[in-house]
């Protein structure tokens, strides 16, 4: 959710139009990843189960569009169960680099923290492309008001 406010009643802000996505999750995957990202035989039944209690959901693997990363819900049962992909016949989780790509970060962006911290940070990040588009619309609104100074 994005909220934009102006202290000027003459401001005529319009959110950017939706853009058609031209990439799928599969396009953002790394061709080779470390073994640590693959799920062990011990955890696999839990991931592939339909959940328990009020958290029942059919597990889906290899989605074209990733589910929200849910960093703030990481301790909730199966909160992020669907962000898994298959590679070489095995199921794995997304790497921090792949999560960064999902949020619009370039591959040149340095990830100087542990994987667990990176997952939290990218899960809580604001998508780069959306932020840029909203900021450009804010700038256009200020320009139209004659209040923009470079």
Task: Explain the meaning of each model-derived region.
Residues 30, 67-70, 100-104, 136:
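Generic alpha-helical structural context detector
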């Amino acid at each position: 959710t994005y909220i934009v406010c102006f202290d000027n009643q003459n401001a005529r802000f319009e959110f950017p139009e939706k853009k058609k996505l031209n990439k799928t999750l599969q396009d953002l995957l790394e061709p080779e990843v470390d073994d640590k990202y693959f799920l062990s035989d011990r955890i696999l039944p839990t991931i592939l189960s339909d959940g328990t209690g009020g958290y029942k959901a059919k597990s889906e693997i290899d989605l074209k569009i990733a589910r929200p990363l849910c960093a703030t819900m990481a301790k909730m049962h199966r909160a992020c169960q669907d962000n898994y992909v298959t590679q070489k016949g095995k199921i794995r989780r997304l790497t921090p680099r792949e999560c960064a790509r999902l949020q619009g970060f370039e591959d040149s962006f340095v990830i100087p923290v542990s994987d667990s911290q990176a997952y939290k940070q990218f899960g809580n990040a604001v998508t780069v492309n959306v932020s840029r588009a909203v900021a450009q619309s804010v700038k256009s609104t200020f320009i139209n008001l004659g209040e923009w100074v470079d």
